[in-house]
Amino acid sequence: MPGPAAGSRARVYAEVNSLRSREYWDYEAHVPSWGNQDDYQLVRKLGRGKYSEVFEAINITNNERVVVKILKPVKKKKIKREVKILENLRGGTNIIKLIDTVKDPVSKTPALVFEYINNTDFKQLYQILTDFDIRFYMYELLKALDYCHSKGIMHRDVKPHNVMIDHQQKKLRLIDWGLAEFYHPAQEYNVRVASRYFKGPELLVDYQMYDYSLDMWSLGCMLASMIFRREPFFHGQDNYDQLVRIAKVLGTEELYGYLKKYHIDLDPHFNDILGQHSRKRWENFIHSENRHLVSPEALDLLDKLLRYDHQQRLTAKEAMEHPYFYPVVKEQSQPCADNAVLSSGLTAAR
């Protein structure tokens, strides 16, 4: 009989929720105030997810353009969690702003109302981004992650679909907090979170005592896909194959070292499919089409994010201090008025 896995604790912001009143994190006790959806006129459907349908809408009281996320029937507890987290994070750097919580007067279906972002589909956008653009948007995403982590919240579904970018205005927002959760040390969490290509190794080996560092793996996957122009970077056919794809890059020996450190027992199915793989050098992924996006600093940052051992990954704040972002920090420390001009000028010059 396998023994229990070893414990683990976040390297940063571990006690944030224990230092706050219970009201802050006890989302099950939260009672959202539901307004009337009649204030909002749906204009067009923007998309649908597993848990919701999303529409562009107009607030008829002030003519403001908004996004309305109509929630599909799920447990009340899940809706309360999303609302509580969005309320706690309201006003946070690059976090999508929750404007209102409403219900359809007839069906009583709950809906969340958000600020509108003129998003460019990432599949098109990522093809035209310059080296500087990638640094800029990754830095903006790190601001959002450091903010939510500092508030005791893991996003748990970081991926391109959940990062809205208005490229004209150079505006980024982290959206879809439906899988987000409060971090409490030693709590065991559901591993059925995040989307396959962005799932950290901890999820794929069923290690439940994970933390904010899960989001840093997902961000690393996004960075890899952007600089190498390979979307997604780890392209597994299922959750088992996903770990195999990771092992083919990071190596199997290193994986076994991780499992040993945390006393993790691997699902026997992996014995048939893992094989033996040596660790690959990041330089192996450079080719003529992506060379202009890759630099030694980019590879160094990537290497410090895509680590099996979640405790070894850079935190959001540490990542922001990495030399890869020096050009962005330098630009953002210029007088404000010049920023947008400077940024577009740099983009045009490349």
From Swiss-Prot:
GO CC terms of this entry: acrosomal vesicle; chromatin; cytosol; nucleoplasm; nucleus; protein kinase CK2 complex
Coiled coil regions, renumbered to chain: none
Record's catalysed reaction(s): L-seryl-[protein] + ATP = O-phospho-L-seryl-[protein] + ADP + H(+); L-threonyl-[protein] + ATP = O-phospho-L-threonyl-[protein] + ADP + H(+)
Pfam families named among the record's database cross-references: Pkinase (PF00069)
Compartment annotation: Nucleus; Cytoplasm
Domain of life of the source: Eukaryota
Additional free-text comment from the UniProt record: Can use both ATP and GTP as phosphoryl donors. Phosphorylation by casein kinase 2 has been estimated to represent up to one quarter of the eukaryotic phosphoproteome.
Name listed for the protein in its UniProt record: Casein kinase II subunit alpha'
The organism of origin for this protein: Homo sapiens
Lineage of the species this protein comes from: Eukaryota, Metazoa, Chordata, Craniata, Vertebrata
